[in-house]
């Protein structure tokens, strides 16, 4: 079984989702997890770390060190479900190919529309001539992240504990 599949299967059985997996030099394995309903606390990271350590031993996974973390305030957007969950939030999107000479966009995500497998995501942004709407598919994205919203008064971003 592929490492990402092994981790994803383990996490889904525990009620978490795999956001990102990184293999860093010197055997470091970084796993970013989330729980859509509640977000991630340090106790969640500890629990997942213990479980993955056990699974990796049983499955004979080669690694030196394991780090388990929340995706952070600037959470990456990887799957269609991420765009659905964070519709209405501000995001920074870099496309694989330029649209009108531009690859980088920052704006408000709109919920995906269209038939299954052909969904288009909307991003409202400030264009050269005023407000504009960019429509793109998940496959058009090189990378996308939420724009961190830091509110020192204690209000939280929808769907997150962070």
From Swiss-Prot:
Superkingdom classification of source: Bacteria
CDD domains attached to this UniProt entry: YlxS_C
Any single Pfam family the record assigns to this protein: RimP_N
One Gene Ontology cellular component: cytosol
Location(s) in or outside the cell: Cytoplasm
Keyword Cytoplasm set for record: yes
Signal peptide stretch: none
Keywords: Cytoplasm, Ribosome biogenesis
GO BP, one annotated term: translation
HAMAP family: RimP
NCBIfam families cross-referenced by the UniProt entry: PRK00092.2-1
Record-stated family: Belongs to the RimP family.
Function noted in UniProt: Required for maturation of 30S ribosomal subunits.
Protein name: Ribosome maturation factor RimP
Underlying gene: rimP
